[in-house]
């Protein structure tokens, strides 16, 4: 008679995938999940289920398990810790062997780690709080096309935050008038203007017309001010081919920077564009449209710091990162946490800032965080203090809303940022004397 190889039936995940004795390897990809199990599901089982379903596991033993080495390939839940103040919630730490992931593919990384497991019945909710990307994996990515230092050298702008402005009204202007608004802002003293994330190629303004008029505006403003100027030309499109066509046209016009919506456009498209940008000397501005769909819920989804790390690997020179100003204090530390993850080489684990793992980017270029959305001149001292020099501050309504027009609005922003930087360099406390600094600058 045939010998029985294994027992059929539903298996407890924790027998295989919960391994508290496991010592993590330097090459492992580590994940911190906030798990809210269904009533009656023990934490070990829920944590193990997450590890299993996001790596090798299925709900039962299959005979092909005998053809592979589970020990080599399985994800492991190696630690579980309760969340302070939450009864039925805990953080599950999962280690994934490096070989589970395709090199240089953020798409594959996400498909594995967050692809399937979030719809799992045994869990009420699941949130990916942080990922530790080992150098062995991050080294397979190009990363940002240029990074902070190269961007400053290209633009010849040092020692202060860069200034931008989103052209409003975002939809409905003709290409010619759009270019006119761009010119006014750049002439007034901004470094960049920006296409709104949803400006692609609509009936009232086709992309090619916009690109041509914006290039004209940039050249005119550069000639008048003697400074290098840019406009984030949004290359996001319905197909990757069309996106590349727009990026190539931008390069032919000789503009310094293009833009992409990396979440709606997708990581595959974004990585292709980032490679093109590095090969052709274009800077790449990244907008995070759709991020709140993924990161806004406290108990479910994915924290933005994970999306930020993914963007640094996929590639972008700027990415939107919230403003802090006017939000809660606690938000400030967390925002600064992922701002550091974008800019720095080495970031220590620091739970108070939401950083669950020490992250070593080795030599991958940094990304400039962009503060944008509802900010204006009076926020400038706070922004300068919070973000420091390596940032882009974007004032849409805060420039175009100036009662005298775009150029005076731009002048106001430029004067304010120069005043704040000077005051800070002279040792004044921007948090306390900020309003005074701005008032003096007004004169």
Swiss-Prot record:
The record, for PROSITE patterns, names: RUBISCO_LARGE (PS00157)
What positions constitute the catalytic site?
Answer: 168 (proton acceptor), 287 (proton acceptor)
Family assignment from sequence similarity = Belongs to the RuBisCO large chain family. Type I subfamily.
Which residues does Mg(2+) bind?
A: 194, 196-197
Give the protein's recorded name.
Ribulose bisphosphate carboxylase large chain
Q: Does the keyword Lyase apply?
A: yes
Miscellaneous section: The basic functional RuBisCO is composed of a large chain homodimer in a 'head-to-tail' conformation. In form I RuBisCO this homodimer is arranged in a barrel-like tetramer with the small subunits forming a tetrameric 'cap' on each end of the 'barrel'.
What the protein does comes down to:
RuBisCO catalyzes two reactions: the carboxylation of D-ribulose 1,5-bisphosphate, the primary event in carbon dioxide fixation, as well as the oxidative fragmentation of the pentose substrate in the photorespiration process. Both reactions occur simultaneously and in competition at the same active site.
Q: Where is this site: Transition state stabilizer?
A: 327
Q: Which residues bind substrate?
A: 116, 166, 170, 288, 320, 372
Q: Does the keyword Lyase apply?
A: yes
What's the cofactor? Mg(2+)
What GO CC annotations are associated with the protein? chloroplast
UniProt EC number: 4.1.1.39
């Amino acid at each position: 008679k045939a010998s029985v190889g294994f027992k059929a039936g539903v298996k407890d995940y924790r027998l295989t995938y919960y391994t508290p004795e496991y010592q993590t390897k330097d090459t492992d990809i580590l994940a911190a999940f906030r798990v809210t199990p269904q009533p009656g599901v023990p934490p070990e089982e829920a944590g193990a289920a997450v590890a299993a379903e996001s790596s090798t596991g299925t709900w039962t033993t299959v005979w092909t398990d005998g053809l592979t080495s589970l020990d080599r390939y399985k994800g492991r839940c190696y630690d579980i810790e309760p969340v302070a103040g939450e009864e039925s919630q805990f953080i599950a730490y999962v280690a994934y062997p490096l070989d589970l992931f395709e090199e240089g593919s953020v798409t594959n990384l996400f498909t594995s780690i967050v692809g399937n497991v979030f719809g799992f019945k045994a869990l009420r909710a699941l949130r990916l709080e942080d990922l530790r990307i080992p150098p062995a994996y991050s080294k397979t990515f190009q990363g940002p096309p240029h990074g902070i230092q190269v961007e400053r050298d290209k633009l010849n702008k040092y020692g202060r935050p860069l200034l931008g402005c989103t052209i409003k009204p975002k939809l409905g202007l003709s290409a010619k008038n759009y270019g006119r608004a761009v010119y006014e802002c750049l002439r007034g003293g901004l470094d960049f203007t920006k296409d709104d994330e949803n400006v692609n190629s609509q009936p009232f303004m086709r992309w090619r017309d916009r690109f041509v008029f914006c290039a004209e505006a940039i050249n005119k403003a550069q000639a008048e001010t003697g400074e290098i100027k840019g406009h984030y030309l949004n290359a996001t499109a319905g197909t990757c081919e069309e996106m590349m066509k727009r990026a190539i046209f931008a390069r032919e016009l000789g503009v310094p920077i293009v833009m992409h919506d990396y979440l709606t456009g997708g990581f595959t498209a974004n990585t292709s564009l980032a490679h093109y940008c590095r090969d052709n000397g274009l800077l790449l501005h990244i907008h995070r449209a759709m991020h709140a769909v993924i990161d806004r819920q406290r108990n479910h989804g994915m924290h933005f710091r994970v999306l930020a790390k993914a963007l640094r690997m996929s590639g972008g020179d700027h990415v939107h990162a919230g403003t802090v100003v006017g939000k809660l204090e606690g938000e400030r530390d967390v925002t600064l946490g992922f701002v550091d993850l974008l800019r720095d080489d080495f970031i220590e684990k620091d739970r108070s800032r939401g950083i669950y793992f020490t992250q070593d980017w080795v030599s991958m270029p940094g990304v400039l965080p962009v503060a944008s959305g509802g900010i204006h001149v009076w926020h400038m001292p706070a922004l300068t203090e919070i973000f420091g020099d390596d940032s882009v501050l974007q004032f849409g309504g805060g420039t175009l809303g100036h009662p005298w027009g775009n150029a005076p609005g731009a002048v106001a922003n430029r004067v304010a940022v120069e005043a704040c930087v000077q005051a800070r360099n002279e040792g004044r406390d921007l948090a306390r004397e900020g309003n005074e600094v701005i008032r003096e600058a007004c004169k």
